[in-house]
């Protein structure tokens, strides 16, 4: 029965529909897996809620065979950044460690309304700030993959709990969030599929804010088709979110035709780093392999230039830190969250925030406050926004002559949990994912193979605005040639 855990969402749905097993049986198997997990992927478990949802799903399968939603009865995990009514939501920060929301985030509500079974809340870097899931108040998450030398490696971040849970067969799919690569990079490190839709495609209502102009909900699954099925369940216009876009939500799964003849694929020359950095040679070889797969299917390969790429990372860290310093100003222990009491209110603020925020969060608040301070606003934040526009314009100009862009997702494989990387090296994990985030473009990470250390490597496909269907179709070609690396 445990092989059931390794099925895709589409396969689970088909077998549930044929009544080869019940949603309750499927859910109980996942609950058992979650209870016995050694990855530290789940921070809050909701078995009673899951079984109740599974019973409802079984009733639907028994009495309604038509118009069944593809997520009915499917066990999923939700990143602990999304509010869940009456279920603890912490952003994996001590300052929110006992926060119980009174409402669901819009994407959570859509997911559950589509019949998904919530197994619990997933670990993450505190307030989504990190690339390794080592910045959580609940401790590190472990990647299910083990390096060839036996070393345990990180799952990536900030959606590390989501990627580890899906790759570790603890849930069939998971909600994540992506600010500068926080769905795509952990998906790459764990050998699964991670998709960030166009900014505004999914509502941000009830999603704890990190950087409001960049944050976007995303999905992590084991197959490209599953990403399509999950994505079409969480998209839609939300009148309560001013950044939500009122645009039709297609059935993304119908876009997967496996036909790309004549499709123009852009290869940005600025993303080729292996000539200067020999340690990136392995992903460069995999990139070439992916290019060949697409050529073999009839795609046209075109070299392009994205000249402002080198500015993307510093611009991103100025903007996201500035927005974080503003968003996190609300956490002071007055209305909710953990409070360190003092007779003096200013001292209480200082103690509460100083004790309950982690090191990385404090670092970004300080950087952001500096960038927004009087005398430096124009020199840093305003200039960063101007360069962001240039990065966006590079993409807009490129999409006049190409349809999609193919790049690596991350420069290297997952690194060891015990490896002490300096802050700059850690930030470089997002070098390939940040530009699409700055431009608000949809992007997907799909596995391309294994490194010499037996760890996953992945490629990223970037599409034009609202062309999630197109990037899913292109990713399905790479998936077809690569095969499923997750065993």
Curated annotation (Swiss-Prot):
Keywords: ATP-binding, Ligase, Nucleotide-binding, Protein biosynthesis. Its EC number is 6.3.5.7. Pfam families: Amidase. One of its GO terms (biological process) is translation. PROSITE patterns: AMIDASES. It catalyses: L-glutamyl-tRNA(Gln) + L-glutamine + ATP + H2O = L-glutaminyl-tRNA(Gln) + L-glutamate + ADP + phosphate + H(+). One of its GO terms (molecular function) is glutaminyl-tRNA synthase (glutamine-hydrolyzing) activity. InterPro entries: Amidase (IPR000120), Amidase_CS (IPR020556), Amidase_dom (IPR023631), AS_sf (IPR036928), GatA (IPR004412). SUPFAM superfamilies: Amidase signature (AS) enzymes (SSF75304). The keyword Nucleotide-binding applies. GO terms for cellular component: glutamyl-tRNA(Gln) amidotransferase complex. The active site is at residues 79, 158, 182. Allows the formation of correctly charged Gln-tRNA(Gln) through the transamidation of misacylated Glu-tRNA(Gln) in organisms which lack glutaminyl-tRNA synthetase. The reaction takes place in the presence of glutamine and ATP through an activated gamma-phospho-Glu-tRNA(Gln). NCBIfam families: gatA (TIGR00132). Belongs to the amidase family. GatA subfamily. Heterotrimer of A, B and C subunits. This is Glutamyl-tRNA(Gln) amidotransferase subunit A. It comes from Ehrlichia canis (strain Jake). The gene is gatA.
């Amino acid at each position: 029965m445990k092989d059931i855990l390794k099925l895709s969402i589409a396969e689970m749905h088909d077998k549930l529909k044929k009544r080869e097993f019940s949603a309750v049986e499927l859910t109980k198997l996942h609950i058992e897996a979650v209870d016995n997990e050694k990855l530290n992927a789940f921070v809050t478990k909701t078995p009673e809620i899951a079984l109740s949802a599974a019973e409802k799903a079984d009733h639907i399968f028994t009495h309604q065979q038509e118009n069944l939603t593809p997520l009915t009865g499917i066990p999923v995990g939700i990143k602990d950044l999304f509010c869940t009514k009456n279920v603890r939501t912490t952003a994996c920060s001590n300052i929110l460690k006992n926060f119980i929301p009174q409402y669901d985030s819009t994407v959570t509500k859509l997911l559950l309304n589509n019949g998904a079974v919530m197994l619990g809340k997933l670990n993450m870097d505190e307030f989504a700030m990190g690339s390794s899931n080592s910045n959580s108040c609940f401790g590190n998450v472990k990647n299910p993959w083990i390096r060839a030398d036996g070393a345990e490696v990180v799952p990536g971040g900030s959606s590390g709990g989501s990627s580890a849970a899906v790759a570790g067969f603890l849930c069939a799919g998971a909600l994540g969030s992506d600010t500068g690569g926080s769905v795509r990079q952990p998906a790459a490190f764990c050998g699964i599929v991670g998709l960030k839709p166009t900014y505004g495609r999914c509502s941000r209502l009830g999603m704890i804010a990190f950087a409001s102009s960049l944050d976007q909900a995303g999905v992590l699954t084991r197959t490209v088709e599953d990403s399509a099925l999950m994505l079409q369940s969480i998209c839609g216009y939300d009148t309560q979110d001013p950044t939500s876009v009122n645009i039709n939500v297609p059935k993304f799964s119908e876009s997967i035709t496996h036909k790309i003849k004549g499709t123009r694929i852009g290869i940005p020359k600025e993303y080729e780093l292996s000539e200067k950095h020999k340690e990136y040679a392995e992903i460069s070889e995999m990139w070439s392999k992916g290019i060949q797969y697409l050529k073999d299917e009839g795609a046209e390969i075109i070299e392009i230039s994205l000249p402002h790429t080198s500015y993307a990372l510093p611009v991103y860290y100025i903007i996201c830190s500035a927005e974080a310093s503003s968003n996190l100003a609300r956490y002071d222990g007055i209305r909710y969250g953990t409070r360190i009491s003092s007779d003096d209110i200013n001292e209480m603020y200082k103690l509460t925030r100083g004790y309950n925020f982690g090191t990385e969060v404090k670092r970004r608040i300080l950087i952001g406050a500096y960038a927004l301070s009087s005398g430096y606003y124009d020199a840093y934040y305003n200039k960063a926004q101007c360069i962001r526009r240039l990065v966006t314009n590079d993409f807009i100009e490129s999409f006049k002559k190409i349809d999609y862009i193919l790049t690596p997702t991350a420069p290297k494989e997952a690194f060891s949990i015990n490896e002490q990387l300096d802050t700059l090296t850690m930030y470089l994990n997002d070098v390939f994912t940040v530009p699409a985030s700055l431009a608000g473009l949809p992007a997907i990470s799909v596995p391309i193979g294994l490194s010499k250390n037996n760890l996953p490597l992945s490629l990223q496909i970037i599409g034009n605005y609202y062309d999630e269907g197109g990037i899913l179709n292109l990713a399905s070609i790479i998936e077809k040639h690569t095969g499923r690396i997750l065993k």
